């Protein structure tokens, strides 16, 4: 993940709005990202039409992802490689077990 140094401008956000509000902003942006991803999934499946082309939702998803990362920067959150690898291995094992059935 390549996060530009310019995005560190968000580091002062909690001091400006308070930590509770910064966490609320993260929660809201996560929900908006999830909503955009669900719209894309519906477009890809072709069921339950969403009314707009997939590219508009892809643009929205990129915007919301940037908002989530901005809030994470504000709260000093960073990805944890150990957790990520552990979760990938667990997920991969489940998929392999499903294929074997």
Language model feature labels by segment:
Residues 1-101:
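Flexible "arm" and connector segments at domain edges
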């Amino acid at each position: 993940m390549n996060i530009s140094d310019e995005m560190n401008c968000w580091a002062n956000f909690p001091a400006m709005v308070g930590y509770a509000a910064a966490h609320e902003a993260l929660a809201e942006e996560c929900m908006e990202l999830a909503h955009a991803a669900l719209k894309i999934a519906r477009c890809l499946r072709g069921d339950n039409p969403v009314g707009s082309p997939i590219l508009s939702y892809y643009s929205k998803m990129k915007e919301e992802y940037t908002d989530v990362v901005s809030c994470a920067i504000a709260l000093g959150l960073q990805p944890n490689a150990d957790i990520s690898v552990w979760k990938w291995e667990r997920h991969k094992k489940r998929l392999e077990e499903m294929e074997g059935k």
